[in-house]
């Protein structure tokens, strides 16, 4: 990340490392099998009721049922594309880690989501294939949410300056650790985070209420969008008024945080202890939390969840789509009663609170700022005219430094993509 400010005297480069993001939610609307009307999930590849083939069609934003048409093509049964031919992504048909579809005449072997993955784990280790599946699943959920918010994603070959790519790496045998983080448009995830037992050990050791794979993706995407939406833009000075000076020395802040910890009063000003470390991390934590709120409200609305508050003046959950919500205040009014209900349901199940957070007024102001930035970016993107089709995203997939097969079944030279310091 670069600090584009003449006050700094020089650009300050850093690779963000984030050991403790921790949020997960289902941002999906309800999907159904077009053959039998059974409800299906975003990740399903077959209907559990009638065994029909399923796949997600990005241009429809729908799960479609399919008949196998032969020659590697499938015929859609979805009313909006009935009879149209598609192909499963290579990572769907061969690697079993995806369920997205491409038009039959698309020459690309990979879907628009898988094309963003630059490096995959070494598949000679069978556990890594399962971790890869989980990583791709979380990544697709992130991409779904960003698309719903109107935020564009380009691969580096389509946008060398602002493109986004992912690397999924494992620790080396010589003790060198892969640090989850973001640097220069590349998000690196340590595949160990896809191991539930490892992630829970880390969560406990770091005293975190949540630690999820999807949360890592959300947080690191915040760093990526900071570079795209804040650095060097009209938002930089307003950002500093809300979050602080982004030109503060990151390495010193990191060292101070791990030496001294967070201030005792951090819940009054920050969404998490880690957010106190540096304005970059405060932004990324707040960004991730905003995505969580939008995802959960989107899901609740899509499933027809309605709350009947006990008092006439208490906020209610309105039947509106969160990503189209113009009023941030209304968004928050819908959010708080839902969290009360969610936590009450969890307690009735004998489980910990599903939403163990308290949003102080200062935190709500930061969320409001994220909302303003995203809304403005979405409006700007919607107003642009482009000749480039949205499914033209492309990238080259390699393997990690320990070898293995890439998404095309080949074994090209690997690249090392550690993002950290």
What is each PLM-predicted segment?
Residues 30, 44, 83-86, 92-95, ...:
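Residues immediately within or flanking Cys/His clusters that coordinate Zn2+
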Residues 33-36, 47-50, 89, 111-114:
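Short cysteine-rich clusters marking metal-coordination/redox-active sites
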Residues 37-40, 54, 93-96, 102, ...:
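Cys/His-rich microdomains that often coordinate metals
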Residues 38, 275-393, 399, 410-421:
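Pan-zinc metallopeptidase signature
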Residues 126, 130-196:
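Auxiliary, metal-adjacent structural segments of Zn-dependent hydrolase domains
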Residues 197-217:
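Short pre-active-site segment immediately N-terminal to the catalytic Zn-binding motif
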Residues 211-231:
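Active-site recognition of the HExxH zinc-binding catalytic motif
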Residues 226-281, 287-295:
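Post-HExxH zinc-binding segment in Zn-dependent metallohydrolases
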């Amino acid at each position: 990340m670069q600090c584009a400010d003449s006050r700094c005297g020089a650009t300050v480069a850093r690779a963000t490392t984030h050991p403790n993001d921790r949020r997960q939610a289902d941002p999906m609307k309800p999907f159904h099998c077009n053959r039998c009307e059974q409800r299906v999930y975003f990740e399903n590849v077959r209907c559990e009721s009638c065994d029909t083939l399923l796949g997600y069609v990005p241009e429809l934003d729908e799960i479609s049922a399919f008949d196998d048409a032969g020659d590697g093509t499938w015929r859609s049964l979805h009313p909006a594309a009935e009879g149209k031919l598609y192909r499963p992504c290579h990572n769907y048909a061969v690697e079993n880690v995806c369920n997205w579809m491409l038009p039959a005449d698309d020459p690309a072997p990979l879907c628009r989501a898988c094309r963003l993955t630059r490096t995959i784990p070494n598949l000679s280790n069978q556990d890594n294939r399962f971790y890869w599946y989980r990583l791709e699943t979380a990544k697709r959920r992130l991409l779904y949410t960003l698309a719903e918010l109107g935020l564009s994603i380009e691969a580096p070959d389509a946008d060398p300056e602002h493109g986004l790519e992912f690397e999924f790496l494992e620790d080396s045998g010589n003790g060198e650790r892969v640090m989850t983080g973001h640097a220069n448009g590349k998000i690196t995830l340590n595949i160990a985070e896809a191991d539930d037992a490892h992630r829970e050990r880390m969560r406990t050791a770091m005293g975190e209420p949540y630690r999820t794979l999807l949360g890592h993706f959300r947080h690191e995407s915040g760093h990526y969008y900071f570079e795209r939406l804040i650095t060097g833009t009209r938002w930089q000075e307003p950002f500093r008024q809300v979050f602080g000076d982004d030109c503060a020395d990151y390495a010193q802040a990191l060292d101070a945080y791990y030496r001294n910890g967070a201030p005792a009063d951090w819940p009054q000003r920050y969404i998490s202890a880690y957010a106190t470390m540096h304005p970059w991390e405060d932004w990324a934590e707040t960004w991730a939390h905003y995505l969580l709120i939008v995802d959960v409200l989107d899901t609740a609305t899509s499933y027809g969840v309605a709350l009947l508050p006990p008092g006439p003046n208490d906020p209610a959950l309105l039947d509106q789509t969160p990503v189209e919500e113009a009023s941030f205040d209304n968004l928050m009014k819908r959010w708080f009663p839902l969290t009360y209900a969610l936590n009450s349901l969890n307690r009735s199940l004998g489980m910990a609170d599903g939403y163990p957070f308290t949003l102080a007024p200062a935190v709500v102001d930061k969320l409001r700022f994220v909302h303003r930035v995203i809304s403005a970016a979405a409006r700007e993107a919607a107003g642009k005219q482009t000749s480039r089709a949205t499914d033209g995203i492309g990238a080259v997939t390699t393997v990690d430094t320990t070898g293995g097969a890439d998404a095309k079944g080949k074994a090209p030279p690997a690249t090392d993509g550690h993002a950290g310091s």
